Structure formats: structure tokens, C-alpha cells
């Protein structure tokens, strides 16, 4: 077994920093689902975290990252929504619930998780929007995040 995959649940190579990209992708997908459920139910964030964390653990995904994403979005929702505002063509609450969950998650990662390259954030958001959202939701998500990334990650995006 390759030393880069030894003991890693996905069996795929990990980056030098020890991050398994497959597990991170799973954590993001589950976080989108949890954010969506939270938006729809208006329920208790802690019970949603507990429910999804239990399911996350069964899938051998990156539980710590899932929890960090979910707490990050819920704790910073107002800031994220306000920051996304100039890049939206309508109010955040008028955006489809799935696309809104995807945008909030990606907005959190773009603003607060500078260790994650902006292209990774955008690509993962597009994939989540394709998987869970409406037929053309991914193009909307891409447009919003491309414009936001230029401002929020100027050094990284080269602008």
C-alpha cells in the first residue's frame, strides 16, 4: 500500500497537509444537506448537528471538518449573507433553499477558511448545486461565487 494512502478511509492519496480531499467533499455535501434542513425547519442547530454528525461518522467522512463547516455557517450566517448580498440578483432569502445553502457554505469557506483554495471552494459548490439543486442552479452559484472570490480572495485570484 502506498504510504500516502495507508490508513486513509478513502484509499485515495492525501495532500501533504494530511487532508483527504474525498472526505472533505463528503463533509461538504453533508454540510449542505444539514444547512438546508436547518433553513427549512428553522429548528435547533444542535440537534441537526448531532443527527448529521452521527450519519457522517457512519460514512467515515471528515467529521471534524463537517462540524467546523456547520458551526462556521450557523455562527456567521448574518455576516455571510451580508457579504453575499452585492453579488446576488435578489435577497438571500429569495434564493432557492438548496442554492442558498450552497452559497452560505461556500461563502463561509471563502471568507473564513483561507486554507482552502478558492477554486476548490467554487468547484465543490458547483458540484453540490448540480447534485442537489435545480437544473440551472449551478450556473447561478458559479456566477455569484466567481464575482465574490475576485473581491474576497484578491491575492489568490490574481486581481
Swiss-Prot record:
Domain of life of the organism encoding this protein: Bacteria
UniProtKB keywords: RNA-binding, Transcription, Transcription antitermination, Transcription regulation
Keyword Repeat recorded: no
Biological processes annotated in GO: DNA-templated transcription termination; transcription antitermination
GO molecular function per UniProt: RNA binding
Gene3D superfamilies assigned: NusB-like
GO cellular component: cytosol
Similarity comment: family membership: Belongs to the NusB family.
Role according to the record: Involved in transcription antitermination. Required for transcription of ribosomal RNA (rRNA) genes. Binds specifically to the boxA antiterminator sequence of the ribosomal RNA (rrn) operons.
NCBIfam families: nusB (TIGR01951)
Protein name (record): Transcription antitermination protein NusB
Species, as recorded: Stenotrophomonas maltophilia (strain K279a)
This protein's encoding gene: nusB
Amino acid at each position: 500500500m502506498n504510504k500516502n494512502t495507508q490508513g486513509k478511509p478513502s484509499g485515495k492519496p492525501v495532500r501533504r497537509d494530511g487532508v483527504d480531499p474525498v472526505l472533505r467533499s463528503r463533509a461538504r455535501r453533508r454540510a449542505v444537506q444539514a444547512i438546508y434542513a436547518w433553513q427549512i425547519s428553522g429548528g435547533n442547530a444542535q440537534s441537526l448537528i448531532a443527527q448529521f454528525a452521527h450519519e457522517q461518522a457512519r460514512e467515515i467522512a471528515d467529521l471534524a471538518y463537517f462540524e467546523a463547516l456547520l458551526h462556521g455557517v450557523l455562527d456567521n450566517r448574518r455576516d455571510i449573507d451580508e457579504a453575499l448580498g452585492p453579488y446576488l440578483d435578489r435577497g438571500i432569502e429569495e434564493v432557492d433553499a438548496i442554492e442558498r445553502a450552497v452559497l452560505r457554505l461556500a461563502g463561509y469557506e471563502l471568507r473564513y477558511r483561507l486554507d482552502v483554495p478558492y477554486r476548490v471552494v467554487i468547484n465543490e459548490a458547483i458540484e453540490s448545486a448540480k447534485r442537489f439543486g435545480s437544473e440551472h442552479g449551478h450556473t447561478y452559484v458559479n456566477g455569484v461565487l466567481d464575482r465574490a472570490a475576485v473581491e474576497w480572495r484578491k491575492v489568490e485570484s490574481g486581481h
